[in-house]
């Protein structure tokens, strides 16, 4: 052990100057006999005699019960000798100066220097364990009359001095351990206000060699007038943390809960993240928390984060910016930094300063990468969540964790929804409307720190309905928005800067897509305002609904597009060719096969597999599959022809020369004369719309290469009926006015009238294509009279044959046919009526008027138009009896389908089983134009 003696004169230590090794050395030596000079004044002797008594229990705590007496004796002797040696050096310094009576201010300054020397860490005790802290019974005041002036500082000082005195030192040869310890307190700052966090190594001052510190920490101590503590390097600056120890902070962070660091465990391991930030201490005169020791209460009061009056609108904007901007560099404009998560490899080497966000601190949920937190490097990704209120659903789902909660009596609470914070000091009213509004940060905002910046606003906007958060004193007014767990403040409440707008993760502006209760509906997060449109800042952005509800609107719903696959071979489809979604290969094959009049024969049983690889093996099965899918050469031309259609020029014999249009038909049509022998009439808009929605040609998929059998014909007719039923559903959905009816009424009308619509369409095709000489079911299924006789339903064919013959007799026009077809859909209702009976009657009356308009296109005069109307409506009434025969035959065939080997498709089977018995039993009401 090195022994240093002060035999020569030494200059007194000057505040702020380089430390003197002689003054810092008494703790390393053993006192010599007779070292106290005889010229000591009498006023200082009682003060010296009181020092060892009080410091015996304060600096080196007394052992608890059951401790070794020899160890206690050794500790008492060593502490007493150190104190005496320190005092002798101080007196020797005074005697060397040649003056035995110094002014009082010099004596107090020297005493402060001696006391500061006593506070220095002891070097040689590195291997000696510190005894556990026991109860301090001494009532002696360390700093004399200064302590009563600052009552809250006394317990805090006593709670921190014990671990400072017993911490393990550095190496024996490290000069920074003793040189840095000697420091005179600055003028105007009491010793009780200059505090350091517990450290186990030698602090690094400006005059000592600095080693890399694993966990630098700094504590900013503010006086009531705002002054800050100073050291040799100058005052602490906000946002600029300074290292205070080598392995000190690292050792403090590594102490497990319950372990003794000088007898006091300040921060548990799980809460070691709170030892890193630089916090501002504010005096709080509060009683000790019940059930806790004075030392624990002092420590919690020392390291708690107070709630300060802040600009909460700016806090919300800065929080979003730090949580969402992954490229934020944290330069001079950085408002705060965040502490690393617990159990992080770099948790002991991150300088953290809590500047403008001291309200509440929450631990992170995700560990960052090891190299994500370089010492004094770029800004680290966000690791803390700052918020004033927490959602109850998310808080209860997580495991409880202990946090340090700000307040007069800080304590450890589990991670449950926090109540309102303590009342804040009175502050000036906000200068802008909505400035006091606080936006709660979502609990999942810190999880996705590496995600894109549009994820927050993207997460607020699209999330499931959750429990509403508890309201804080600065929370926005509650809203009853469906599907939103929280609400956003008004746009005016946030700072009107571009950085704040981008930090919030919201688009610059949104255009109103849909409306909910008269308010603009928020659109997709990537949908921004187009150029030229005015910016929209709705006053209430908190009325949100999930995207699922917005897409359920029948007026704005969009069905998912079908997968582009060829319906023939399964290859990637290139488009809709000849009425079917096919690939280019099948398109060319069908065109060549139909135009070349090839007679393909299948080498197998007409059931070959047609796919992308084997589609060229059997052209017969490929062509059959094309016909079954509904491909037709005239499909495209027929579709274009239906879109734009004009009335055919009538012969001069059929129509007289152009004459004046009667008054009664002037509303129905207009006549434009291009030449003396040709008249072109404009079609009413509704009839023109009916032409555009007319279904395309549908194929039955019947194999005409095989001989006809009863079962094959019936099966092909059933397949055709299934496709036509789907076509009727699609057509009715496009029918003007039909969607205004109740959904149950729509289904009922289709189920009651699908057979009438099929037979009526059969008669129209037979009339148009073969002039009513045959039954034109489909382009690939045309029955002449010979094939009718060979079938098992010849009598039924004769019944259906009456319809095209009536069309030929009446010379029905396409406009009349389209209006009559809609009236057939509305000709049968249940006995009890429909749910939307009023809308149904209005719709039916409107289409009756359209039929009159269609009649007026050809008939001149009221008498002829009335006769024509009677003939057409009589035909509609006669269809009821004809369709009843079809219903009876269809139900009988359906019941005997297994015996007859007839296949019925699924949808058609459901309609037959559910509705045909009701219709045949008379449980429906046919709407007739004329009485029987």
Swiss-Prot record:
UniProt region (AF2), positions on chain: 686-932
This protein's name: Progesterone receptor
MF annotations from Gene Ontology: nuclear steroid receptor activity; sequence-specific DNA binding; steroid binding; zinc ion binding
InterPro entries membership: NHR-like_dom_sf, Nucl_hrmn_rcpt_lig-bd, Nuclear_hormone_rcpt_NR3, Nuclear_hrmn_rcpt, Progest_rcpt, Znf_hrmn_rcpt, Znf_NHR/GATA
Motif placement: LXXL motif 2: 115-119
Region (Mediates transcriptional transrepression) location: 165-304
DNA-binding region per UniProt: 566-638
Organism: Hylobates lar
Subcellular location: Nucleus; Cytoplasm
Its job: The steroid hormones and their receptors are involved in the regulation of eukaryotic gene expression and affect cellular proliferation and differentiation in target tissues. Transcriptional activator of several progesteron-dependent promoters in a variety of cell types. Involved in activation of SRC-dependent MAPK signaling on hormone stimulation.
Keywords: Cytoplasm, DNA-binding, Isopeptide bond, Lipid-binding, Lipoprotein, Metal-binding, Nucleus, Palmitate, Phosphoprotein, Receptor, Steroid-binding, Transcription, Transcription regulation, Ubl conjugation, Zinc, Zinc-finger
Any one annotated GO CC term: nucleoplasm
SUPFAM superfamilies: Glucocorticoid receptor-like (DNA-binding domain) (SSF57716), Nuclear receptor ligand-binding domain (SSF48508)
